[in-house]
């Protein structure tokens, strides 16, 4: 059964979902119907520690659904260190795909913050897009949050 928990943070409401002990999604926004679990409370604690600058890397079991290439891209994103960025082109070159495809896969990321698609920017240094509620402004806020820690 899917468990759901929404909670407020200094960067907005976050809703997390899990099946058993695997994280299904992290999204921005609030969901009315909730049925939390001890695992979701652990996830919430890690997210709050990340937002406060006390956690640089998450340690959670993720339930990731997608093609092999999508999973490779999301895995590569998790290797980008806290406070650092990579370009869509750098990731595309490493995985032998196109920067546009990397951007599309970032837009399909259902584990925002945990799989840090906000750390991927354009080659010219501009931010590109962000699928989270709040869009590019939230992406900029997340990057600034990490750089200021």
Task: Give the location of each predicted region.
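The DNA-recognition helices of helix-turn-helix-type DNA-binding domains
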Residues: 109
């Amino acid at each position: 059964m899917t468990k759901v928990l929404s909670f407020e943070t200094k960067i907005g409401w976050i809703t997390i979902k899990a099946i058993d002990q695997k994280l299904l999604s992290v999204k921005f926004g609030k969901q009315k119907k909730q049925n939390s679990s001890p695992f979701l409370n652990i996830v919430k604690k890690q997210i709050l520690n990340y937002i406060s600058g006390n956690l640089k890397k998450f340690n959670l079991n993720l339930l990731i659904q997608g093609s092999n290439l999508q999973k490779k891209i999301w895995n590569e994103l998790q290797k980008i260190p806290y406070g650092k960025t990579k370009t869509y082109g750098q990731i595309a070159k490493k995985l032998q795909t196109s920067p546009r495809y990397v951007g599309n896969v970032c837009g399909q990321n259902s584990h925002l913050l945990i799989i840090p698609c906000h750390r991927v920017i354009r080659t010219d240094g501009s931010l590109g897009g962000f699928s989270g509620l709040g869009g590019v402004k939230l992406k900029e806020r997340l990057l600034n949050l990490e750089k200021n820690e």
